[in-house]
Amino acid sequence: MERVGGFAQKKPTPVKRGGASYDATQQFCKNEIERYVEMYRQLKVEDQTARLIRDMIDVLLRRYHGYSIKENIGAHYYETGLPHGTKTEFEHVIPASVARDLLLFDRLTVDEALNIPTCRLSATKHRKLNSTKLGSTTPDIYWFWKRYQELGITVTTHDGVAVDTATWNLDSHYSYFKNEIHSN
C-alpha cells in the first residue's frame, strides 16, 4: 500500500450557496433520480439491488430537500405562532419514503418528488408527531395536512401566508410553489 504514502488530501473549493448552487443541486439530483428510477423499472425481481436503488433515491431526495429547500427557504411551511428563537426541526409533511414510492410507481414526477411539502415544526410538536403512528406515514397523501390536523398544528407558508389545512391539498401546494419547482 505504498501508493498511499505522501498523499495530501486537497480541500474542495468552497461553493457559495445561492441560486446557481441550488439549481445545480436540483439538476444533479433530478438526473440521478431519473437514472435510478429507470434502473429500478428494469429489475425483474425485488432483491437487494432494488433496496439499494430505493436507498439511493432516498439519499438524493433528502440531499435536495436539505440543501435546496432547508438551506434556501427553510421549509415550504412553518408552524404558526412560534416565538422568535424557538428550536424548530425540518419535517417532511409527506414522508420522503412515501414520495419515493409515489415516484417509482409513476404517481409523482421527479420535480414533484423533489418538492414534496416540508415544514419547520417546534421540537415539541415534532416529537409529539413522531410518538404517534403518524411519524413516518400519512393517513391521506392528497390531503396531506390530516396528520397535522389530528395534533392541532396550524401552519403558514414560508413567506407568511396562512394555510387553511382543511382545504389546502397537494394541488394547492404545487400550485403555490410552482416557481420552486423547476422543469428543466
Model segments located where?
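Histidine-centered nuclease catalytic patch
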Residues: 82-113
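Nuclease and nuclease-like effector domains acting on nucleic acids or nucleotide cofactors
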Residues: 1-85, 131-184
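Residues that flank catalytic or metal-binding motifs in active/ligand-binding sites
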Residues: 86-89, 117-118, 144
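A structural signal for short, well-ordered beta-strand segments and their strand-loop junctions
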Residues: 89, 119-123, 157
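Amphipathic alpha-helical interaction surfaces
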Residues: 66, 96-100, 124-128
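Short Cys/His-centered divalent metal-binding micro-motifs
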Residues: 112-139
